[in-house]
Every structure is written in structure tokens, then in C-alpha cells.
């Protein structure tokens, strides 16, 4: 009898511990979502204003006039042997504030291309990153390598818009989309000849990305609660992504040792922003990271 009571108490205690862990997880996620939700809410307001200026039907019509047989150059750039480098053109960020007071974005993009970047990530989010659609359009005219539109996609409108301003890929963030939206937006991007970089922060979001049919999964190493970065997040979550799915590590890579650690773990590409943006010699900085 005593043994039975002990077993029951142990079982109940274990369940309570599991419940506590789940509550801690949900509380932490809510803190992170608050930041993303604020930016996403701003994006929704931006889309509403954009629709007034150019209706969705017109945005769709313009996108469908473009050739959808693109060959998905962004995906091809990441699928090549060895580590691929997505270099970011970014003026500011919520975590670091103003990064580049002087922001010669076209010149930066040209430097990245000359340095051997495989693709360029261009921030177009205006409220928190001081980005503009025009940055991407002008960079598109100046370089030949693929461009990722780095923004907070909250509406199908933004996917058609991305195609029309010259992007080769869009960012889809699991934390601000429902599973249905993620699946739908991934499909729309594919129909337009755009690649979708589906961003996850944890195990649940990786599973969500895979369920939506993502062919490129990116893991953000930044903790959105306190803005610290830990590339072990990518090392840990890489194991959940099948080898036939391209894997991108985002944020926090500062040294050749960081890159080597990710190479050993089967990472296909890294997205690097601040480290390169703060470098006076971007070609030398990228060469050092490549090793």
C-alpha cells in the first residue's frame, strides 16, 4: 500500500513539474511574442495603407505579369556545396538601434557582391529597422545575386509586393503566422517563383515550418526576450530538419569559429548582418568568416 501511495505521489509530482515547465515556456514565449506582435501590428497598418494606394487586385495582376519560371535563384544559391553567405543591408534594428547613420545601401550591396556573397538580405521594414521598399528595388538594379526581402510578412499582399519590387525570396516568420497562413503564403511564394525562408525560434516552430512544406528553414539565434544570441540554438535545432531541407542560421555569427561550428553541424547557409554592417572593410570581414 505504501509503495502504491509513493508511486502515485511521484507521478503527480512529475506531472506538476511538467506543468510548471510548460507554464514557464508559455510565459517566455509570450514575452517574445510581445515584441514580434508589436512589429507585426505595425506591418498590418502599413499593409492597410498600401492597399489604399494600390489595391491587392492590382498588386496580384502586376506580379502575375512577371515570369514565374525564375529557377528559384535564392534557393539555388544556398544549395551549392559548402557554406553559403547571406549578407544583410540593414540601417537599424530594435536590439542595436541605429547601426549605419550613413547608409549607402547600393554601395554596400555592390561590396557584398564583389566580396563573394551568395545572396543579400535587404530590410524593408520602416518603423523598427528604418528600411524601405526602394532600397531593394535600387539594389536589384545594381547587383545580380539573389535578394531576400527581409520584412514581417503578415498579409499575402506583401508577397505579391515583394515580387513586384524585385525580390527573389521572402521571409515568413512562424511566430507571427498561423499554420494555415504559413502554408498559404509558402504556396503563393512558390507560384510566383519566389523562395520562402521560413524562420523558427524553437522546436515547435521548426515542426510548423516543416508541416507547411518549407524547403528552406531558418533558425533565429536571437532571444527576443533579452536580445542575447546563442548559435547553439541552430546547432540544437538542426537535428530536427531533414537533410533535403536547406538550413539557415540567422544572427550572432561573429567569428570564423562560429561559422566552423555551424559547418560541422551541416548548416547550409548563414545570414549575417551587424558583423558585416559595422565592418569598414566588408570584403576582408567576409573573407575572414569564410576561412
Label each PLM-derived region with a short phrase.
Residues 154-165, 204-212, 253-270:
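Catalytic cores of alpha/beta
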Residues 39, 87, 112, 162, ...:
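Conserved, mostly hydrophobic/aromatic
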Residues 164-180, 219-226, 267-285:
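Glycine-rich phosphate-binding active-site loops on the catalytic face of alpha/beta enzymes
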Residues 89, 96-197, 203-208, 234-237:
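N-terminal active-site wall of soluble small-molecule enzyme domains
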Residues 237-240, 278-291:
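C-terminal helical cap(s) of enzyme catalytic domains, especially alpha/beta-barrels
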Residues 32-100:
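An N-cap/entry alpha-helix motif that binds or orients negatively charged groups
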Amino acid at each position: 500500500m505504501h509503495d502504491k501511495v509513493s508511486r502515485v505521489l511521484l507521478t503527480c509530482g512529475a506531472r506538476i513539474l511538467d506543468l510548471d515547465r510548460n507554464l514557464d515556456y508559455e510565459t517566455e514565449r509570450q514575452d517574445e511574442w510581445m515584441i514580434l506582435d508589436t512589429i507585426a501590428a505595425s506591418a498590418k497598418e502599413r499593409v492597410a495603407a498600401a492597399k489604399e494606394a494600390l489595391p491587392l487586385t492590382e498588386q496580384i495582376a502586376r506580379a502575375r505579369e512577371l515570369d514565374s519560371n525564375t529557377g528559384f535563384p535564392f534557393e539555388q544559391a544556398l544549395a551549392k556545396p559548402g557554406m553559403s553567405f547571406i549578407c544583410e543591408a540593414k540601417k537599424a534594428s530594435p536590439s542595436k538601434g541605429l547601426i549605419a547613420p550613413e547608409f549607402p545601401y547600393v554601395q554596400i550591396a555592390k561590396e557584398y557582391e564583389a566580396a563573394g556573397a551568395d545572396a543579400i538580405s535587404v530590410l524593408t521594414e520602416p518603423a523598427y529597422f528604418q528600411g524601405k521598399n526602394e532600397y531593394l528595388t535600387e539594389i536589384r538594379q545594381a547587383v545580380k545575386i539573389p535578394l531576400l526581402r527581409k520584412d514581417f510578412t503578415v498579409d499575402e499582399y506583401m508577397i505579391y509586393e515583394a515580387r513586384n519590387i524585385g525580390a527573389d525570396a521572402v521571409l515568413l516568420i512562424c511566430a507571427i503566422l498561423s499554420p494555415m497562413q504559413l502554408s498559404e503564403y509558402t504556396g503563393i511564394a512558390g507560384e510566383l517563383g519566389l523562395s520562402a525562408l521560413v524562420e523558427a525560434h524553437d522546436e515547435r516552430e521548426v515542426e510548423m515550418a516543416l508541416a507547411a512544406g518549407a524547403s528552406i528553414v531558418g533558425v533565429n539565434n536571437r532571444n527576443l526576450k533579452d536580445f542575447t544570441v546563442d548559435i547553439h540554438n541552430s546547432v540544437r535545432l538542426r537535428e530536427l530538419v531533414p537533410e533535403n531541407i536547406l538550413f539557415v542560421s540567422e544572427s550572432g555569427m561573429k567569428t570564423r569559429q562560429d561559422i566552423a561550428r555551424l559547418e560541422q553541424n551541416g548548416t547550409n547557409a548563414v545570414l549575417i548582418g551587424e558583423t558585416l554592417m559595422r565592418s569598414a572593410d566588408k570584403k576582408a570581414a567576409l573573407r575572414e568568416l569564410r576561412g
